[in-house]
Amino acid sequence: MTQSNPNEQNVELNRTSLYWGLLLIFVLAVSFSNYFFN
């Protein structure tokens, strides 16, 4: 039981980092599209 908790926390951290990475890529894509269209 004690070993499953850190593993679950690591999975949650990986999910949050993945979501932040996707959000960052989305923002960069929008900024680049605005730059090229302008």
From Swiss-Prot:
Disulphide bond pairs: none
GO CC field: chloroplast thylakoid membrane; photosystem II reaction center
Entry keywords, A to Z: Chloroplast, Membrane, Photosynthesis, Photosystem II, Plastid, Reaction center, Thylakoid, Transmembrane, Transmembrane helix
Location of this chain's protein in the cell: Plastid, Chloroplast thylakoid membrane
Annotated transmembrane regions: 17-37
Bilayer disposition of the protein: Single-pass membrane protein
InterPro entries: PSII_PsbL (IPR003372), PSII_PsbL_sf (IPR037266)
Biological processes per GO annotation: photosynthesis
Subunit field text: PSII is composed of 1 copy each of membrane proteins PsbA, PsbB, PsbC, PsbD, PsbE, PsbF, PsbH, PsbI, PsbJ, PsbK, PsbL, PsbM, PsbT, PsbX, PsbY, PsbZ, Psb30/Ycf12, at least 3 peripheral proteins of the oxygen-evolving complex and a large number of cofactors. It forms dimeric complexes.
Biological role stated in the UniProt entry: One of the components of the core complex of photosystem II (PSII). PSII is a light-driven water:plastoquinone oxidoreductase that uses light energy to abstract electrons from H(2)O, generating O(2) and a proton gradient subsequently used for ATP formation. It consists of a core antenna complex that captures photons, and an electron transfer chain that converts photonic excitation into a charge separation. This subunit is found at the monomer-monomer interface and is required for correct PSII assembly and/or dimerization.
Family from the record: Belongs to the PsbL family.
Protein name: Photosystem II reaction center protein L
Native species: Amborella trichopoda
Gene behind the chain: psbL
